[in-house]
Amino acid sequence: YRQQGYNKRFRMGGNLTYHQPDMGMKILNYGLNVDFLTNQYGDFFIWRSPTEVYKPSPFTNMGREENNFHIDPFINYVNPENGTSHKIKGRFYHSADNIVRPSSGASITDILGNMGTNAQTIQNIAGGDYSSLYPALVGIGSGLINGNLEDAMNGVFTSLGNIFPNATTADYCDLISWVMDNGIPGDLGSIQNGQLPSDLIPWLSNVMNPSRNDSKTKTDKSYNYYLDYQFNKKWDGGAQITTGMTYEHVRYDSSIMDEVYKSDNVAAFFQYDQRFWDRLSVSAGVRAEYYRVDNHYREAETKILGTKVPFRPVFRAGLNYQLADYSFIRASIGQGYRNPSINEKYLRKDIGGVGIYPNLDIKPEKGYNAELGFKQGYKIGNFQGFVDVAGFYTEYKDMVEFQFGLFNNADYSMINSISDAIRMLMDGKGFGIGAQFHNVSKAQIYGMEISTNGVYNFNKNTKLFYNLGYVYTEPRDADYKERNELEDAYSDALQMKEKSNTGKYLKYRPKHSFKATVDFQWKRINLGANVAWKSKILAVDYLMLDEREKQQKDLMDYVRTILFGQSRGETLASYWKKHNTDYATVDLRFGVKATKEVAFQFMVNNLLNKEYSYRPMAVAAPRTFVLKMDVTF
């Protein structure tokens, strides 16, 4: 449904298990699972304009080709006579992927033609007649004198309108993207000395060549080796222990970074479980992890008795108590710790044309979570099922979040000031739009969830299955006040802020969500429906939107207009304000199981044809009809 969007997948796999005979009560089996996936897809992260929501921006005209393969050997041994078991799991995983263009970009002649380029005006400027540029000069002068950026920008766009009378903001993006692909004059430093770049003529000659410079395909490769051993011992009194070790080695060959990264992760774990009075079950465990990347041998440290050790222990505990028949209460608390992955910390990748940029300063995130829940079974007439209610609380320190921004493609640094933008132009590698993972000092996420699932039995051939759930979440940015004070002091027009508003909520999260699934089955026929409802998104990235009150537009507003388009008076900000609301969707499906091996299903997704977005510029699919056939053999 999105222009230039496609997904072609081929998957093949299998498994082989050998059960050792003549073992008596003991059980021994071993084997392996194998899976291969090849995937080609095209997509985009940024639209062309608010009236072309299913068309890609030229900045994000990219797709990927990838091939994945893994083989998972395993060995299981169980001895019921002494209540022990041994399990060994392994995995070798290989992945290779590279960037492709779903379509070739427009040629310079097409771009200039769409913009209605006035050749006479360009010729007049070349001949020394600068009258068409007067509006820009007057506007900039007025802006400098009066401190009014709007006057300056209106003057600039008026002058550009004299040269490109038919141009839209999307056309300017086409032109900028074309120049980024073909480079800019390398000798921009001579402009500071009042001279034209020495390589201007060769560059202009290349610009007038309608063919783009196609770069050589670069393939990223990763290799993953995983081994896990688990020992379990059960006693007649209801006690059991589970212990073991895990080792994982990752090698990543990055063609873009021209580097090879290696990581090792070693973990040891122990868990004790005990059952009392056939009603109460308690559990407690600890896991200690050591992690390193290349020669960084201490990615994580813990102080024990005044001495720093290069591993991190985390603890968890929980209980489950049966109050009555089909009635249970549970509670759990646990620590969490996660090291940034190689992708998050070291790599430069492209996903849908949006770059993922490295951040060597990112730190591990840590925290804890707690949950209290109640589960009750019920049987009312022909209804039977369970209802579950739970409250949860999670607190993070140095929580890892992504932040969208503009980046200098020369050194992959974020453009965070006007001087950074000037340096990007001087470097001559252009800019990129993308995300960088960074730490949010402190975050709290708490809320409650209620759900029920079950079945209504009409007779042995006719049943109604249902699953309903509601989640309330309070995703708090605990340091938002301090961050707002810091951002209020920003003086550079291009300095990036954390999010689109000054509120207390984390980005890209709704407060409320509800989902219901109902399936009516009669013999081989199935009729089902999905109903989903979500509340609006509470905050997004500052690069996309700025919802703060302001007297006049600032420089970033004009940057957003160019990057994300303005068409028929509509901008991303006005579109998001209109469409970032509570929304509901309905999907229907009808299926027939023709034989034991063959089944057909007809689906209507987004039955009400609701136009909604789960993030800026991610407009979901309109009403879609799908016919599906499943064959099992």
What is the meaning of each model-derived region?
Residues 1, 20, 36-40, 79, ...:
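Transmembrane beta-strands of outer-membrane beta-barrel pores
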Residues 1-15, 41-49, 55, 89-91, ...:
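Surface-exposed extracellular loop regions of Gram-negative outer-membrane beta-barrel proteins
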Residues 2-15, 19-78, 82, 92-113, ...:
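Flexible loop and strand-edge segments within Gram-negative outer membrane beta-barrel domains
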Residues 87-91, 95, 322, 328-332, ...:
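Membrane-embedded beta-barrel scaffold of Gram-negative outer-membrane proteins
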Residues 234-242, 246-250, 254-394:
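Structural signature of Gram-negative outer-membrane beta-barrels, strongest in the C-terminal barrel
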Residues 337-338, 395-398, 402-407, 532-573, ...:
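C-terminal beta-signal and adjacent terminal beta-strands/loops
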Residues 386, 390-395, 413-543:
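Gram-negative outer-membrane beta-barrel transporters
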